[in-house]
Amino acid sequence: MSKDQLIRITGVKNLTGISKSYIYQLCQEDRFPMPVKLVPGGTSVAWVASEVQDWIDARIAERDGGAANE
C-alpha cells in the first residue's frame, strides 16, 4: 500500500475485520485513526492506509508483548 493511499470504510473493514459501527466508536474514543474528509464540506470520508496499517501492527505487537516497529 502506498503511504498516501486513502481507503474507504469497506477497505478498513476488510483489513481489520471490525464492523463499521465499531470502527466509528473506536474513532470517537481516540482508539483508531480518524478519517479524513474527501471533499471540504462534504460527508464522504476515507482513512490513510498507512495509519490503519500502523494500528494493525500495534495490535499485533501488543499481542506479542512488544512495541510496534521494534
Task: Go through the PLM ranges and name each one.
Residues 6, 46-47:
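Short aromatic/basic micro-patch
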Residues 11, 47-48:
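A composition-driven signal for long, intrinsically disordered, charge-rich low-complexity tracts
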Residues 16-46:
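Major-groove DNA-recognition helix of helix-turn-helix-type DNA-binding domains
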Residues 1-28, 54-59:
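Polyanion-binding surface elements
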Residues 9, 40, 63-64:
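Intrinsically disordered, low-complexity segments enriched in small/polar residues
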Residues 51-70:
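A short, Lys/Arg-enriched interface patch at domain edges and termini
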